[in-house]
Curated annotation (Swiss-Prot):
Provenance organism: Prochlorococcus marinus (strain AS9601)
Family statement: Belongs to the TrpC family.
EC number: 4.1.1.48
Gene Ontology MF term list: indole-3-glycerol-phosphate synthase activity; phosphoribosylanthranilate isomerase activity
Example GO biological process: L-tryptophan biosynthetic process
Domain of life: Bacteria
Name the UniProt record assigns to this protein: Indole-3-glycerol phosphate synthase
Protein backbone atom coordinates (compact mmCIF):
# COMPACT_ATOMS: atom_id res chain seq x y z
CA UNK A 1 0.00 0.00 0.00
CA UNK A 2 1.18 3.52 -0.71
CA UNK A 3 -0.71 5.20 2.12
CA UNK A 4 -1.29 4.63 5.80
CA UNK A 5 -4.76 3.21 6.37
CA UNK A 6 -5.21 4.78 9.80
CA UNK A 7 -3.72 7.79 11.61
CA UNK A 8 -1.00 6.88 14.12
CA UNK A 9 -2.39 7.90 17.49
CA UNK A 10 -1.26 5.40 20.13
CA UNK A 11 -3.30 4.81 23.24
CA UNK A 12 -1.44 4.97 26.56
CA UNK A 13 -2.62 3.36 29.79
CA UNK A 14 -1.62 4.82 33.17
CA UNK A 15 -3.11 2.95 36.13
CA UNK A 16 -6.88 3.07 35.44
CA UNK A 17 -6.73 5.85 32.86
CA UNK A 18 -6.50 5.51 29.09
CA UNK A 19 -5.76 8.40 26.78
CA UNK A 20 -4.46 9.15 23.31
CA UNK A 21 -1.11 10.82 22.81
CA UNK A 22 -0.83 13.24 19.86
CA UNK A 23 1.53 11.70 17.32
CA UNK A 24 3.92 13.79 15.25
CA UNK A 25 2.74 11.99 12.10
CA UNK A 26 -0.97 12.13 12.91
CA UNK A 27 -1.60 14.55 10.04
CA UNK A 28 -2.58 13.03 6.69
CA UNK A 29 0.24 13.31 4.14
CA UNK A 30 -2.08 13.89 1.19
CA UNK A 31 -5.74 14.14 0.16
CA UNK A 32 -6.06 10.41 -0.50
CA UNK A 33 -4.83 9.52 2.96
CA UNK A 34 -7.19 12.06 4.54
CA UNK A 35 -10.14 10.59 2.64
CA UNK A 36 -9.31 7.02 3.64
CA UNK A 37 -8.86 7.93 7.30
CA UNK A 38 -12.28 9.54 7.30
CA UNK A 39 -13.83 6.38 5.80
CA UNK A 40 -13.34 4.52 9.08
CA UNK A 41 -15.43 7.16 10.86
CA UNK A 42 -18.05 7.16 8.10
CA UNK A 43 -18.44 3.37 8.15
CA UNK A 44 -18.84 3.30 11.93
CA UNK A 45 -21.59 5.92 11.65
CA UNK A 46 -23.35 3.94 8.90
CA UNK A 47 -23.31 0.81 11.06
CA UNK A 48 -25.08 2.67 13.85
CA UNK A 49 -27.99 3.27 11.46
CA UNK A 50 -28.09 -0.03 9.54
CA UNK A 51 -26.22 -3.17 10.59
CA UNK A 52 -24.36 -5.40 8.15
CA UNK A 53 -26.85 -8.17 8.89
CA UNK A 54 -29.76 -5.95 7.88
CA UNK A 55 -28.03 -4.99 4.63
CA UNK A 56 -27.48 -8.65 3.77
CA UNK A 57 -31.17 -9.39 4.35
CA UNK A 58 -32.19 -6.56 2.02
CA UNK A 59 -30.00 -7.94 -0.77
CA UNK A 60 -31.89 -11.25 -0.84
CA UNK A 61 -34.82 -9.70 -2.72
CA UNK A 62 -32.82 -7.62 -5.21
CA UNK A 63 -32.59 -8.46 -8.93
CA UNK A 64 -29.34 -9.78 -10.39
CA UNK A 65 -26.81 -6.97 -11.01
CA UNK A 66 -26.38 -5.74 -14.58
CA UNK A 67 -23.26 -6.75 -16.50
CA UNK A 68 -20.80 -3.85 -16.44
CA UNK A 69 -18.14 -5.65 -18.51
CA UNK A 70 -20.57 -6.68 -21.25
CA UNK A 71 -22.04 -3.20 -21.61
CA UNK A 72 -18.64 -1.64 -22.22
CA UNK A 73 -17.52 -4.45 -24.53
CA UNK A 74 -20.66 -4.19 -26.69
CA UNK A 75 -20.91 -0.40 -26.66
CA UNK A 76 -21.81 1.20 -29.99
CA UNK A 77 -19.65 4.17 -29.00
CA UNK A 78 -15.93 3.38 -29.03
CA UNK A 79 -14.41 3.62 -26.53
CA UNK A 80 -17.35 2.76 -24.26
CA UNK A 81 -18.37 5.58 -21.94
CA UNK A 82 -18.71 5.40 -18.17
CA UNK A 83 -20.37 8.76 -17.60
CA UNK A 84 -19.98 10.10 -14.08
CA UNK A 85 -22.35 11.95 -11.80
CA UNK A 86 -20.26 14.14 -9.51
CA UNK A 87 -21.21 17.37 -7.78
CA UNK A 88 -17.86 18.37 -6.29
CA UNK A 89 -14.24 17.36 -5.72
CA UNK A 90 -11.56 18.17 -3.13
CA UNK A 91 -9.46 20.02 -5.69
CA UNK A 92 -12.18 21.98 -7.54
CA UNK A 93 -14.91 22.42 -4.92
CA UNK A 94 -18.45 22.48 -6.34
CA UNK A 95 -18.28 21.58 -10.03
CA UNK A 96 -21.99 21.59 -10.80
CA UNK A 97 -24.31 23.91 -8.88
CA UNK A 98 -27.41 22.90 -10.86
CA UNK A 99 -27.13 19.30 -9.70
CA UNK A 100 -30.04 17.00 -10.58
CA UNK A 101 -28.82 13.36 -10.56
CA UNK A 102 -32.07 12.00 -12.01
CA UNK A 103 -31.99 14.30 -15.06
CA UNK A 104 -28.27 13.73 -15.57
CA UNK A 105 -28.73 9.93 -15.55
CA UNK A 106 -31.58 10.11 -18.05
CA UNK A 107 -29.47 12.36 -20.27
CA UNK A 108 -26.46 10.01 -20.15
CA UNK A 109 -28.55 6.97 -21.07
CA UNK A 110 -30.20 8.80 -23.94
CA UNK A 111 -26.81 9.83 -25.33
CA UNK A 112 -25.50 6.27 -25.45
CA UNK A 113 -23.35 5.92 -22.33
CA UNK A 114 -22.47 2.29 -21.52
CA UNK A 115 -22.58 2.71 -17.75
CA UNK A 116 -22.91 5.42 -15.11
CA UNK A 117 -20.55 6.13 -12.23
CA UNK A 118 -22.00 7.74 -9.10
CA UNK A 119 -19.86 9.43 -6.43
CA UNK A 120 -21.08 8.37 -2.97
CA UNK A 121 -18.43 10.03 -0.80
CA UNK A 122 -20.15 12.78 1.17
CA UNK A 123 -17.44 14.81 2.91
CA UNK A 124 -15.06 15.33 0.00
CA UNK A 125 -17.27 14.97 -3.10
CA UNK A 126 -20.72 15.92 -1.77
CA UNK A 127 -22.04 12.56 -2.93
CA UNK A 128 -24.23 10.04 -1.10
CA UNK A 129 -25.79 6.61 -1.30
CA UNK A 130 -29.13 8.39 -1.55
CA UNK A 131 -27.96 9.87 -4.86
CA UNK A 132 -27.06 6.36 -6.00
CA UNK A 133 -30.58 5.18 -5.10
CA UNK A 134 -32.10 8.08 -7.06
CA UNK A 135 -30.01 7.27 -10.12
CA UNK A 136 -30.95 3.58 -9.89
CA UNK A 137 -34.62 4.55 -10.21
CA UNK A 138 -33.84 6.77 -13.21
CA UNK A 139 -31.88 4.48 -15.54
CA UNK A 140 -31.48 0.90 -16.72
CA UNK A 141 -27.74 1.27 -17.26
CA UNK A 142 -25.24 -0.56 -15.02
CA UNK A 143 -24.18 1.64 -12.10
CA UNK A 144 -20.72 1.94 -10.56
CA UNK A 145 -20.52 2.94 -6.91
CA UNK A 146 -17.56 5.34 -6.94
CA UNK A 147 -16.22 5.38 -3.42
CA UNK A 148 -13.03 4.73 -1.48
CA UNK A 149 -13.88 1.19 -0.44
CA UNK A 150 -11.94 -0.30 2.46
CA UNK A 151 -14.65 -2.48 4.03
CA UNK A 152 -17.05 -5.22 2.97
CA UNK A 153 -19.81 -3.16 4.58
CA UNK A 154 -19.48 -0.55 1.83
CA UNK A 155 -19.96 -3.19 -0.86
CA UNK A 156 -23.19 -4.44 0.71
CA UNK A 157 -24.39 -0.88 1.14
CA UNK A 158 -23.59 -0.13 -2.50
CA UNK A 159 -25.55 -3.17 -3.65
CA UNK A 160 -28.58 -2.28 -1.51
CA UNK A 161 -28.44 1.24 -2.96
CA UNK A 162 -28.61 -0.08 -6.52
CA UNK A 163 -24.99 -0.47 -7.64
CA UNK A 164 -24.05 -3.18 -10.12
CA UNK A 165 -20.31 -2.58 -9.78
CA UNK A 166 -17.81 -1.21 -7.30
CA UNK A 167 -14.46 0.54 -7.54
CA UNK A 168 -11.42 -0.86 -5.73
CA UNK A 169 -8.35 1.40 -5.59
CA UNK A 170 -5.03 -0.47 -5.56
CA UNK A 171 -3.25 2.43 -3.85
CA UNK A 172 -5.30 2.09 -0.66
CA UNK A 173 -5.65 -1.70 -0.45
CA UNK A 174 -3.23 -4.54 0.21
CA UNK A 175 -3.25 -7.60 -2.04
CA UNK A 176 -5.13 -9.54 0.65
CA UNK A 177 -7.71 -6.74 0.90
CA UNK A 178 -8.18 -6.71 -2.87
CA UNK A 179 -8.74 -10.47 -3.02
CA UNK A 180 -11.13 -10.43 -0.05
CA UNK A 181 -13.23 -7.52 -1.30
CA UNK A 182 -13.31 -8.98 -4.82
CA UNK A 183 -14.70 -12.24 -3.39
CA UNK A 184 -17.44 -10.32 -1.58
CA UNK A 185 -18.38 -8.61 -4.84
CA UNK A 186 -18.24 -11.91 -6.74
CA UNK A 187 -20.61 -13.51 -4.23
CA UNK A 188 -23.04 -10.66 -4.87
CA UNK A 189 -22.52 -11.05 -8.64
CA UNK A 190 -21.25 -7.47 -8.83
CA UNK A 191 -18.58 -6.31 -11.27
CA UNK A 192 -15.33 -4.84 -9.99
CA UNK A 193 -13.34 -2.05 -11.60
CA UNK A 194 -9.88 -1.99 -10.06
CA UNK A 195 -8.00 1.29 -10.34
CA UNK A 196 -4.26 1.75 -10.80
CA UNK A 197 -2.05 4.81 -11.17
CA UNK A 198 1.32 3.35 -12.14
CA UNK A 199 3.15 0.23 -13.33
CA UNK A 200 3.84 -0.97 -9.78
CA UNK A 201 0.13 -1.09 -8.95
CA UNK A 202 -0.72 -2.63 -12.32
CA UNK A 203 1.86 -5.40 -11.84
CA UNK A 204 0.28 -6.18 -8.46
CA UNK A 205 -3.15 -6.47 -10.05
CA UNK A 206 -2.00 -8.66 -12.94
CA UNK A 207 -0.30 -11.08 -10.54
CA UNK A 208 -3.58 -11.54 -8.66
CA UNK A 209 -5.26 -12.77 -11.89
CA UNK A 210 -8.68 -11.78 -10.57
CA UNK A 211 -9.72 -8.65 -12.46
CA UNK A 212 -11.06 -8.15 -15.99
CA UNK A 213 -11.81 -4.41 -15.66
CA UNK A 214 -8.75 -2.26 -15.02
CA UNK A 215 -9.03 1.49 -14.72
CA UNK A 216 -5.94 3.57 -15.40
CA UNK A 217 -6.43 6.79 -13.47
CA UNK A 218 -4.64 9.72 -15.04
CA UNK A 219 -5.16 11.68 -11.84
CA UNK A 220 -2.45 11.62 -9.21
CA UNK A 221 -4.56 11.02 -6.11
CA UNK A 222 -1.94 12.65 -3.92
CA UNK A 223 -2.01 15.96 -5.81
CA UNK A 224 -5.23 15.51 -7.87
CA UNK A 225 -3.43 16.71 -11.03
CA UNK A 226 -4.16 14.85 -14.30
CA UNK A 227 -1.96 13.73 -17.18
CA UNK A 228 -3.01 11.36 -20.00
CA UNK A 229 0.60 10.26 -20.19
CA UNK A 230 -0.23 7.74 -17.45
CA UNK A 231 -2.65 5.84 -19.70
CA UNK A 232 -0.38 6.10 -22.74
CA UNK A 233 2.71 4.80 -20.95
CA UNK A 234 0.92 1.86 -19.34
CA UNK A 235 -0.88 0.91 -22.56
CA UNK A 236 2.42 1.02 -24.43
CA UNK A 237 3.74 -1.67 -22.07
CA UNK A 238 0.64 -3.71 -21.22
CA UNK A 239 -1.80 -3.48 -24.16
CA UNK A 240 -0.91 -6.96 -25.48
CA UNK A 241 -1.33 -8.49 -22.02
CA UNK A 242 -4.76 -6.91 -21.64
CA UNK A 243 -5.78 -8.32 -25.02
CA UNK A 244 -4.54 -11.84 -24.27
CA UNK A 245 -6.24 -11.92 -20.86
CA UNK A 246 -9.54 -10.39 -22.05
CA UNK A 247 -9.05 -7.40 -19.77
CA UNK A 248 -10.90 -4.20 -20.61
CA UNK A 249 -8.57 -1.21 -20.03
CA UNK A 250 -10.40 1.95 -19.02
CA UNK A 251 -8.84 5.41 -18.96
CA UNK A 252 -10.07 7.66 -16.15
CA UNK A 253 -9.83 11.43 -15.59
CA UNK A 254 -8.35 14.26 -17.63
CA UNK A 255 -10.25 13.50 -20.85
CA UNK A 256 -11.33 16.89 -22.15
CA UNK A 257 -11.64 16.80 -25.94
CA UNK A 258 -12.17 14.61 -28.99
CA UNK A 259 -8.42 14.55 -29.62
CA UNK A 260 -7.88 13.01 -26.17
CA UNK A 261 -10.44 10.31 -26.95
CA UNK A 262 -8.96 9.52 -30.34
CA UNK A 263 -5.45 9.23 -28.91
CA UNK A 264 -6.69 6.83 -26.21
CA UNK A 265 -8.74 4.74 -28.64
CA UNK A 266 -5.76 4.42 -30.98
CA UNK A 267 -3.62 2.81 -28.26
CA UNK A 268 -6.22 0.20 -27.31
CA UNK A 269 -8.25 1.87 -24.55
CA UNK A 270 -11.70 0.23 -24.62
CA UNK A 271 -13.50 2.40 -22.09
CA UNK A 272 -13.30 5.90 -20.67
CA UNK A 273 -14.62 7.29 -17.42
CA UNK A 274 -15.57 10.94 -17.83
CA UNK A 275 -17.15 13.12 -15.19
CA UNK A 276 -15.83 16.62 -14.68
CA UNK A 277 -15.79 17.40 -18.42
CA UNK A 278 -19.56 16.83 -18.49
CA UNK A 279 -20.38 18.19 -15.03
CA UNK A 280 -18.83 21.61 -15.55
CA UNK A 281 -20.86 22.26 -18.73
CA UNK A 282 -24.37 23.73 -18.56
CA UNK A 283 -25.43 21.64 -21.56
CA UNK A 284 -24.31 18.05 -20.94
CA UNK A 285 -25.79 16.82 -24.22
CA UNK A 286 -23.79 19.33 -26.24
CA UNK A 287 -20.62 18.49 -24.31
CA UNK A 288 -21.12 14.75 -24.89
CA UNK A 289 -21.76 15.15 -28.62
CA UNK A 290 -18.78 17.47 -29.00
CA UNK A 291 -16.56 14.73 -27.57
CA UNK A 292 -17.93 11.71 -29.39
CA UNK A 293 -19.48 12.79 -32.68
CA UNK A 294 -16.12 13.38 -34.30
CA UNK A 295 -14.52 10.00 -33.57
Amino acid sequence: MEIRRRPPNPTVRVENLEYAVPHREAQAKNILEEIVWHKDIEIKNFKKIVSLEDLIKKIENLPTPKDFYKNILESKIKPGVIAEIKKASPSKGVIRKDFNPENIAICYEGLGASCISVLTDKKFFQGSYEILETVRKSTNLPLLCKDFIISAYQIYKARVSGADAILLIAAILSDDDLIYLKKIADNLKMSVLVEVHNSYELERILKLKSFNLIGINNRDLKTFKTDLKTSKELMNTYADIFLKQNIIPISESGINCAEDLESLRSIGIMGVLIGETFMRETDIEQSFKKLFNSI
